[in-house]
């Protein structure tokens, strides 16, 4: 059972829901006229894969990474949203309604190292690549077929 006493961190929460609700549906979504579903067990595995990637990046950068999310809420978005803090990083969900200049200003203030983005926002990403030098890596959420294969 998940309680306040046994769930102190996001990591604890992700691990416990994966164990306690392993075979229950976490999310259903439609893509190309097909309905897909992911269970809590799969979500936990994918989120822990993002956490493992984040741990490698923490070592590479020499500090806990600051990762921004630019996109609509979806399965991959949710794995990054909780996966990065599971490894001690910081997740910054960006407001998709902000203009490019404000995004740059906010990302600079937040010292963003990595941007995870939805392919629908590629024009903003191109602008950020040209105008936001603090971001060292750009990862398209849809380019990763299986979240457990996040690029090195």
Q: Would you name each region that the model predicts?
A:
Residues 86-152:
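Structural core segment of the AMP-binding/adenylate-forming
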Residues 28, 69-70, 139-140:
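Short beta-strand segments
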Residues 17, 27, 39, 43-50, ...:
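Adenylate-forming
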Residues 14, 80, 125:
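Aromatic/hydrophobic pocket-lining residues that form π-stacking "cages" and hydrophobic walls in ligand
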Residues 13-38, 61, 145-148:
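AMP-dependent adenylate-forming
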Residues 2-28, 45, 50:
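AMP-binding/adenylate-forming domain of the ANL superfamily
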Residues 44, 74-75, 100, 122:
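Alpha-helix N-cap/helix-start and coil->helix boundary motif
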